[in-house]
Amino acid sequence: GMNVGYWNGKTLETPLPSLGFILGDEASGADIGKRLVRGVFEKRLPQSLIDAFFASYPISLQELLDKVYKQSCPNAFLAQFAPFVIAHKNESAMQEIINEAFSDLFTYYINPLRKTYKTQKISFVGSIAHALSEYIVLKTQNEKCSLEKIISRPLDFLERKDCSAKY
């Protein structure tokens, strides 16, 4: 999933709701996977990428629709395709998917938050952010943000902090 918040030094403020993978979750694994399968099944990607996709994921349109609309955890199902985009991120069609996902994330979530809280500092957490860090670096430069950090796993970050507080 995806969420955006502002750390005020004591608590995390989340003024914009996460709308989930159907209505939102821009730049999440599910979002990137959804963008990929649309490109594959709508034949908007180069044939070489479509062939590579089906070699990795031999799935029919009917199976795809069943998994997305009739079975549990469709977001996790769609997120399983994000590694394909990451593995082929040097292909222009995959770069377009990635850039569109991050552009939407900034347009709908990050830029409104920056405006509300008058901040240019930004950090990212998660495996997708880590795997696509070079795209985040470029996007934050283009948006004139100060990229503070990209953390692959939140627990790794917390383990480095003093977590001796009693809860």
State what each model feature region is.
Residues 8-9, 59:
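Intrinsically disordered, low-complexity regions enriched in small/polar residues
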Residues 1, 18-19, 127:
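Fold-independent oxyanion-binding glycine-rich loops
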Residues 12-57:
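Glycine-rich phosphate-binding loop plus the immediately following alpha-helix
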Residues 1-8:
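Short beta-strand scaffold segments in enzyme catalytic cores
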Residues 38-167:
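ATP-binding/phosphotransfer module of carbohydrate and carboxylate kinases, centering on a glycine-rich
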